[in-house]
Amino acid sequence: MPETPQLKSVTLRTLQQMKSAGEKIACLTCYDASFTRVLEAAGVDMFIIGDSLGMVLKGHETTVPVTMADMIYHGANVARVGQHALRVVDMPYMSYANPEQALGNAARLIAEGGADMVKLEGGQDKADIVRHLVSHDIPVCGHIGLLPQSIEELGGYHVQGRDEAGARALLADAQALEAAGATLLVMECIPAELAALITSSVSMPTIGIGAGPDCDGQVLVLYDMLGITPGRLPRFVRNFLQDTDTVSYTHLRAHETVRSISYA
């Protein structure tokens, strides 16, 4: 069995240094204290306490019903025992409709939910909100491509940015978010070539989910990785548990795989 990676405290500066060095960032969603301990022991660099919990924990069809109370509760679960991995907490649907509302809710996610930074969905249309949060010392992670909170508007779970106009718009989104002060970017379900272009065009680290191997890091939904999500999984998801004996060894395998870029 591989040795457990040496634990270290991960900060935004750490992630920036990893990008500069070409070292891949290992990220998973996490929602509770027990998995936090196991994942940190496996050397995961960052957690996204995602509104995906609405689907994998609460049984909803989308992330839309997730509330601020949900995000604070699960963020605090992770923060209570987390010591090393950077914690990114999602801002749920309609919690950042305007800059002042976003500021109040983001402050709660940090103060009550233990977030190191908050994540919100959208691109150029959210630049003013990002700028407002950053001006109040709240670190922001952007999220472009497939936006689960806008799934009805997007017409389902489909790859975004396939055509030239869509690709240009996503590149402009990434650049606008960085200009507004975002320091991390999640890119979901976009073509690998586009993700590589965006990654090389911005200085902030990029985290891909279904966005090819050339992002600065990869993230998967924990329950997808363990193969316990019902229904059909996205094609980019690999079940790491099926070939291992324990959950902790599964996480070590996933960590090593992200480092070697053998899935994405």
Write out the residue ranges for each language-model feature.
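Short clusters of hydrophobic/aromatic residues that line enzyme substrate/ligand-binding pockets
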Residues: 15, 159, 240
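Hydrophobic alpha-helical segments, chiefly the membrane-spanning helices
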Residues: 262-264
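Alpha/beta enzyme core
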Residues: 12, 27, 31-60, 64, ...
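N-terminal amphipathic alpha-helix/helix-capping segment at the start of soluble metabolic enzymes
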Residues: 1-27
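Conserved small/polar residues in nucleotide/adenosyl-binding loops
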Residues: 250-257
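Catalytic cores of large soluble enzymes that bind and process phosphate-bearing ligands
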Residues: 7, 63-70, 239, 243-246
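Short, solvent-exposed beta-strand edge segments and adjacent coil->beta transition regions
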Residues: 23-25, 115, 237
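A hydrophobic, small-residue-rich beta->alpha segment in the mid-to-C-terminal subdomain
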Residues: 229-249
